[in-house]
């Protein structure tokens, strides 16, 4: 069998059209979602990613701004800018682009974001709400993964799902989302023993560790669904996933490519959460 290719670009395009329709409906009520992104320093990858978010937001009718601070900005300066955005009623959602310079505590900054504007879903309050099944902002990559699975009509109930990676950004939250869909979830990590035995029994594999070639054909069950979150540049700058794509697609039931799989959905869910933030604070039903 040859796997169905889960085209994240097309899924994202369709989803963004739905978001655009909702933004237009919200504007008719007098409300326009606004996304503000704080960028500290001149890291090329961060600048490119932030510009992509701004462009995507504006394309569906949102307002977006980049607040660019110098590489030498102090923690206090970043906190002051963040506090201004927290108190600005025109701002629906706030993102702080990471990594931050070494003189700025990432944790302190993320905890200073107003939880009601935390569209990355990284604030401890929002993480806690996710784990007690309250409505909240869910981290964008896990949310995008779930949309891919939904779009592909993957029934997760009772299925064995293996998540490789335990980060607070992807591994742990996507495990919780899979649990909410009644999957039986196993989390593997760098200290796990005999990973192959778990992978061979998995109906769904989500790999998010940034190790090219980690998931090989010999550990994948025929017909399994493979979600590859890895995006490690090789020596030529080409992005590589965690999965041996060419070999695994010959046996998997469905698979995401890299690039063009999960990535487009991550930015899409930033927009989704910004829209949700505006609706929640204006008392508009989702």
From Swiss-Prot:
A Gene Ontology term for the protein's cellular component? cytosol
Question: Could you tell me the keywords of this UniProt record?
Answer: Amino-acid biosynthesis, Histidine biosynthesis, Hydrolase, Methionine biosynthesis, Multifunctional enzyme, NADP, One-carbon metabolism, Oxidoreductase, Purine biosynthesis
- Which GO molecular function entries does the Swiss-Prot or TrEMBL record give? methenyltetrahydrofolate cyclohydrolase activity; methylenetetrahydrofolate dehydrogenase (NADP+) activity
Catalysed reaction, written as an equation: (6R)-5,10-methylene-5,6,7,8-tetrahydrofolate + NADP(+) = (6R)-5,10-methenyltetrahydrofolate + NADPH; (6R)-5,10-methenyltetrahydrofolate + H2O = (6R)-10-formyltetrahydrofolate + H(+)
What EC number(s) is this enzyme filed under? 1.5.1.5, 3.5.4.9
Q: Which GO annotations describe the biological process of this protein?
A: L-histidine biosynthetic process; methionine biosynthetic process; purine nucleotide biosynthetic process; tetrahydrofolate interconversion
Describe its assembly.
Homodimer.
> What is the role of this chain?
Catalyzes the oxidation of 5,10-methylenetetrahydrofolate to 5,10-methenyltetrahydrofolate and then the hydrolysis of 5,10-methenyltetrahydrofolate to 10-formyltetrahydrofolate.
Name the chain's protein: Bifunctional protein FolD
Tell me what organism the protein belongs to.
Staphylococcus aureus (strain bovine RF122 / ET3-1)
